[in-house]
A protein has these predicted regions:
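Alpha-helical metal-binding/catalytic segments enriched in His/Glu/Asp
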Residues: 54-55
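Extended beta-strand/beta-hairpin segments
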Residues: 1-49, 60-135
Length: 135
């Protein structure tokens, strides 16, 4: 299987991940509370962001398949860390959709596919995923 991402440790608790097909680069820094500079996303920030991105992406796929428009959205993400062991204990997502005319049936479809997205299903069951949808 061909590689799709190249990750380099570049010193000072920083990494660079390159998406090989597009050459897009994501930089991570260790957070200040974990001996880093905190000048970029931390790896755990990316986990929280990936959860939200996955949810909104599968919602878009659902809308396309069901032939309705998914309104643009803005989400706010809160990541809660625990210390023993150091891990993400909770991710809170608030996903706000622009003015829309979605039916209640389509809203329920969108919520269901979001909660069942691949990232949500891949995370440890001990991690609390609190999602607020504002349509």
């Amino acid at each position: 299987m061909p590689h799709s991402i190249e990750n380099k440790y570049v010193g000072e608790l920083r990494t660079e991940s390159t998406h090989l097909k597009s050459s897009n680069v994501i930089i991570t820094d260790a957070p200040k509370d974990n001996n880093g500079k905190g000048n970029a996303f931390s790896p755990t920030d990316l986990v929280a962001s990936a959860l939200c991105s996955c949810m909104t992406t599968v919602m878009g796929i659902c809308a396309n398949k069901n032939q309705f428009d998914l309104p643009n959205s803005t989400a706010y993400i809160t990541k809660v860390m625990s210390s023993h062991p150091r891990r993400i204990s909770k991710i809170i997502l608030e996903i706000n959709f622009d003015n829309n005319n979605l039916s209640e049936q389509n809203i329920e479809k969108l919520k269901a596919v979001a909660i069942g997205c691949p990232v949500a299903q891949s995370l440890n069951s001990d991690l609390i995923q609190e999602v607020r949808f504002n349509f």
